[in-house]
Amino acid sequence: IYDAVAGIRNETVLLEPGKVNFALYKKIDASNRIVEAMNPTSRMKAVKNPVEMENLRKAHLKDGVALTKFLCWMKKNAGKVELRETEAAERLEDYRKAQEGYLGPSFTTISAFGSNAAMCHYHATKEQESPVGTDGFYLVDSGGQYYEGTTDVTRTIAVGHVTDEMKEHFTLVMMGMLRLMNAKFLYGCRGLNVDYLARGPLWERGFDFNHGTGHGVGFLSAVHE
């Protein structure tokens, strides 16, 4: 891309400063006129059109079938047979592959048990992973690319015995999710304005989570958009 940009002459070049590094900027020839503005496709992608929304629902139905089968399998096997984090991720991938129109994962699956589940963007490998034990939380953060769109879903299940403190934290997070999911907000409201709905139950007890509440998802493209 650097050579391609360097070859542009006597043109008007749209530049989004927050998305272009300095090295690429320096490749723009002085004969060009630079216009600093947001990429016009960003706003178009930020709001899904009716066709995209309809197809995303179809993608999530397929993904939901795969995830439901996986969670059923996990509840039958986790804590009862020897099971490792990567094995669980592979099983989920098999369920997704069985869905018509599945193209592949939308990102590397986060399959984490116990303390690993508290690590943002943890990645288990065959060389470094943990067994899915008998007492604790198992978290799976995963998604798929389908012809109908892109998914990104996180679920947490209890394996074996969990403490009262763990139950409380789980319940508070669930309360926040339900509050945000069922909220009615006005046109023009930003994500920042409704963030408290998700964090409120935790804040009221003096807790918080050191992570974003959510993010945009592309349409058969980048899962973080």
List each language-model region with its residue ranges.
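Active-site neighborhoods and metal-handling regions in enzymes and metal-associated proteins
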Residues: I1-E225
